[in-house]
Regions:
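Non-catalytic, conserved peripheral segments adjacent to functional cores
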Residues: 1-95, 109-141
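Glycine-centered loop/turn positions within well-structured domains
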Residues: 104
C-alpha cells in the first residue's frame, strides 16, 4: 500500500505570466476544487540548507507550491524504505498534491529564504500530525 501511496503524489505544472513589472504566478483555479474541500492556506519559510523533517499527516492533503526560492521535498515509504524526491521553485514552478499518510520533509536549496504555500483540505490540528526526528529516517539530504 505504501508504494502505491507514493505514486499518488501528483505534480501539476503551473503558469507564470512574465511581466517587466513583476510576474503573475497561478496557483489554483476554482474548477480544480471540485474533488476536494479547501479549508486553509498558509505559508512556511525555510532557510538555505535548513531541513524540516519528518512529518506524517493522518488526514490532511497538501497542495504545495514554492513561489519564492527552491525547495527539495522528500517523501518516504516505510513499507519498503523507498524515497521520492521532488524539487519545486525556481526553474520548476508547479503544484505538488500529497495525500495523507506519507512521511515527508523538506530542505531549502536556494541561497535566500524560500516560501512554501500550502492549500490544504483541513485546518491545522496537531492531533492529526505524527512527527519524528530528522535522523530517525535515514536520508542523505
Amino acid at each position: 500500500m505504501d508504494k502505491k501511496l507514493l505514486d499518488k503524489i501528483k505534480i501539476k505544472s503551473l503558469k507564470i505570466i512574465r511581466l517587466p513589472e513583476g510576474d503573475i504566478m497561478h496557483v489554483l483555479k476554482k474548477s480544480e476544487l471540485k474533488n476536494w474541500n479547501f479549508n486553509e492556506a498558509y505559508f512556511s519559510k525555510i532557510k538555505f540548507n535548513k531541513i524540516k523533517a519528518w512529518k506524517y499527516h493522518l488526514k490532511m492533503t497538501l497542495n504545495l507550491t514554492v513561489p519564492q526560492g527552491k525547495v527539495k521535498f522528500v517523501f518516504y515509504s516505510a513499507k519498503d524504505s523507498r524515497f521520492k524526491v521532488i524539487k519545486l521553485g525556481e526553474g520548476h514552478y508547479a503544484r505538488l498534491t500529497v495525500p495523507p499518510k506519507i512521511w515527508f520533509g523538506f530542505k531549502g536549496i536556494s541561497k535566500h529564504e524560500s516560501i512554501i504555500l500550502n492549500l490544504s483540505n483541513a485546518t491545522h490540528d496537531p492531533k492529526e500530525i505524527l512527527r519524528c526526528k530528522k535522523n530517525d529516517i535515514k536520508f542523505n539530504w
